[in-house]
Structures are given as C-alpha cells and as structure tokens.
Amino acid sequence: MSEITKITAQKRRGRYNIFIDGTYAFPVSETTLVDYRLAKGMVLTAETVAQIKSSEVTAMGLEIGLTYISHQSRTSKEVSDRLAKEDLPADVIQKVLTRLTDLGFLDDADYAHRYIEEHLKMGELGPRTLQHKLQQKGLKPDLLANELAAIPTTAWLDAAVRAGQKNLRHHQHRAYKDQLQRLRVALMQKGFDDTTIQTAIATIDPQPDPEAESDLLKLEAAKQWRLKAKYDDRERKQKVKTTLFRKGFDVEAIDEVLDDLAES
C-alpha cells in the first residue's frame, strides 16, 4: 500500500504531479485527478496505481486526438495513425477512437458525405478518384459505395463539364483532334466513367476553328521543318509529317503545308 503525500500543480494548466510516500511518482491530468478523486492522504494499492497510469495514458491519447481533429475533420484511420506516431498501445488507441466517436467528433460516414459534397460543389473529380482518395484515408469500401451511389448522375456530369471546360482552355492552342483526345484522357484520369465523359463532351460541344487551326499548323510545321533540317528532303518531309499527324492535324492539310515549305 502507498500513500499520496503531496499533489502539486504543474506550470502547464490542467496537469498535476503526484507524490507517493514523499517521492514524485507520476503526472496526471485534471480529468484523471477528478475521476479517481486523488487527494493527499489517499492510500493506493499497486493495482490502483497501475489503473491510474493506464487512464492517464488514455487521457493523453484523447488530448492528442482532440488537438489533431481541432484543425480539420479527420477519419478514424487518420486519428489512429496520428496516435500510433506517439507509440501509444493499440488498446489505448482503440479506447481513444471509441471515446471520440461517442463524443461525436469522429464519424466516417459523415466525413465521406461532406468530402464528396464539397468536391462536387467546386471540384472536378469523378467518383472513381474520390473513392480512391477516401479509401486512402481509411474509409471502408461498402461505406463509400453507399455514399457515392446516393449522388445523382447530374452532379457528376456538372463536375465533368467543369473539368472538361478547364482542360480545353488549357489546350486551346493545340489541334482540334489533339484537344479532344486530351480532353477524354483527362476526364478518365479524374475518375469519370465512359457514359459521363461522352455526355460531358456532348454538353461542352467543342467546335473546331479552321482558321486558327490553319495558322497553328503553319507555325508548327515551320518549326518542325527547321528542327529537322539535317535530314534529306524526303526523310525530312516524312518526319515532319509524322510529328504533325501525332499532334492531331489533318493529313491533307499537312501535305499542303509541307509542299509549300519544300518549294520555299
């Protein structure tokens, strides 16, 4: 049996030092102090001391968890990973997660719902990408499947259209065919399905600009013609033609421009 001979407050608010039999024993939080009704003269068994220390570790974990989620919403896995960095025992981490969930500070379903809604309002990501991002945050596949299924197809279409319009603006100085190809690839990479991609492109309805494309072709052809000046005329023409074709320009238009360059 041991007796608490002194309790002193630390400089840190809400923290106290416990002295047993005249010797410093361990620190406790105010919560632990109140929960165990610790006071000078109280007699403690070895088992009680062990329980107090265990509770204090849990209280410390809870404090770390609360601080971590105070900056922004987190998933259970994110909090668990943060606590693990403090080398807290697995059972303590689970107690903290349970406590935070009971207090309403951890709710993976609500987190997923708000994350998806926020991205749909202003974002440009499709369901596949959002699912992948949320799975990385530790959310379960069945939970995500339910949340994503609840989103109307029109919402995904709006996001795809936003993404598509942004992509087209970025590549407006490219050949029309190249623009369309890059647009499709970009929407696929952002996680939209084929049906949504096709509908989004039809909604955006990008149109070619023959005059602008002709000017662009002439500039690009002249550039490539200079870059490949070391080849003989036949090989030079073929290499330039191949390059321009890969950039999405029309074959007949390429031939016309190359004929002009060859004659100049």
Curated annotation (Swiss-Prot):
Domain of life per record: Bacteria
GO cellular component terms listed in the entry, alphabetical order: cytoplasm
Record key words, sorted: Cytoplasm
Localization, UniProt: Cytoplasm
Keyword Cell division: no
Pfam families: RecX_HTH1 (PF21982), RecX_HTH2 (PF02631), RecX_HTH3 (PF21981)
GO biological process: regulation of DNA repair
Keyword Ubl conjugation in record: no
Recorded family membership: Belongs to the RecX family.
Role played: Modulates RecA activity.
Record-linked PANTHER family: REGULATORY PROTEIN RECX FAMILY PROTEIN
Entry protein name: Regulatory protein RecX
Origin organism lineage: Bacteria, Bacillati, Bacillota, Bacilli, Lactobacillales
